[in-house]
C-alpha cells in the first residue's frame, strides 16, 4: 500500500523547513530567515515507530497578492490537497497572527486531520502559546525544531493519526500497472482505451490519498489493476497546477506498481521530467515499458521508427533493457500489444535462475573475461545465487566487495541477460564478503 503523505504547512518563517530537516534527519530544505525561501515542495520518506510516511515541506502560506507569494500559496494548497495528515506550524514566540488565522480557516475547509505545532518553544514555561487554541484545531504540540525538543512526542502524535494500514484487497497474482508521464501525453486516453476494451471493470477501490482510485479488471483469466487512475480519468475536476501535481502522483503510483507504463508524446520527444519519473521507476526496481503515444500524428517513412528508437536509447541509455511500443491510444493502434507486453515483462521480473546454472554462467564469464586487478588485488567470485525477484536480485559472494568495478558488474549483468533475458526489468546485485574457493 502507498505511504501516507504528511504535509508541513504554515505562514512564512515559522520553522517548517527546520522541522522537516529534523524529522528526515538531513539538511535538505533551505533554512534561512527570509520569507519565501522554500518556494517549491520537497518530498522525503521518513519513518517513526515502524511506520513509514512521505513528508512534504512547503513554502509559506501568505495571502498577499504578489506573484511569488501566489505561487507559494498554490504549492502549499496543493500539498494540503495531497496530504493524508497536516502539520500546521506556528511561531510560539511571535504568537497568533492574522495569517495564522487565515491558514487555520483554510485547513478547516480542507477537512483533513491537523496537528497544530507550536514551534520555537525552547522553554515550555516561558512562552505563552495558548492563544493558538483560538484556531479551533485542538491542543498545540510545543516543540523546538532547531533544538529537537519534544519532536519525539510530536512524531508519536503523528503516528497515532496516520491512516490505518489496510490489507491488500487484490488477489496475490494481480499485476499492478502504473501509467505515468507528463500531462497531455495521452495517459488518460490509454487508460480509458484499456478499460473500455475490456468492459469488465470489477471495482473501484479508494487508495490512501483523497481521490486515488485503482481500477481493477480481468482478461483471459488474469487479474490487473491500473493504479491511481482518478487523476487521469477525472482531470477536469481537479483545479490544480497539473504539471507539478503529475510528478507527485506518478511517484506514488510507481511505489505501488509492478509494471510502469512510461508514456511519451511522439510529437514532443523526451523531457527532463520524463527522465526523472522513469528513472525513479528504474531505481525502485519496477518493470518498465516505454509507450510512444500519438504515433498516428507522425509523418513516417521506412526508417522513422528506427530513428525514434535510436533517439530514445541515446536519451535513456540506462534503460537499454526496456521494450518500446509505438501506439495511438486515440485510434487504438497497437494498444492490444500493451497488456501482452505487461504480461511478458511481469513474467520476466518474476523469473528465477537455478543456482547451478547461475554459477556455471558466472564461471564461464569470469574465465572468458577475468575481473580486473585493483592495486595488486583481484576480485574473486566464490559463489552466486538468486536472492529474490521483482526485481531479479543476485547475491555474489566475493573476496573483496569494494573492488568490484561498475563496468565489470555491468558485464556480468549483460551475460545474465544474454542467457536468461530479463527483458523489461532491472537487475540488482548484492556483494557479500566471504573466504572460500572459486566457483
From Swiss-Prot:
InterPro entries: G_ENGA, GTP-bd, GTPase_Der, KH_dom-like, KH_dom-like_a/b, P-loop_NTPase, Small_GTP-bd
GO molecular function: GTP binding; ribosome binding
Keywords associated with the record: GTP-binding, Nucleotide-binding, Repeat, Ribosome biogenesis
EngA-type G domain segment(s): 4-166, 175-350
Gene3D superfamilies recorded: 3.30.300.20, P-loop containing nucleotide triphosphate hydrolases (3.40.50.300)
Pfam family, one: KH_dom-like
Binding positions for GTP 2 per the UniProt entry: 181-188, 228-232, 293-296
GO biological process, one term: ribosome biogenesis
List of residues binding GTP 1: 10-17, 57-61, 119-122
Annotated KH-like domain residues: 351-435
Function: GTPase that plays an essential role in the late steps of ribosome biogenesis.
Complex formation: Associates with the 50S ribosomal subunit.
PANTHER family for this protein: GTPASE DER
Family per similarity comment: Belongs to the TRAFAC class TrmE-Era-EngA-EngB-Septin-like GTPase superfamily. EngA (Der) GTPase family.
Protein name stated in the entry: GTPase Der
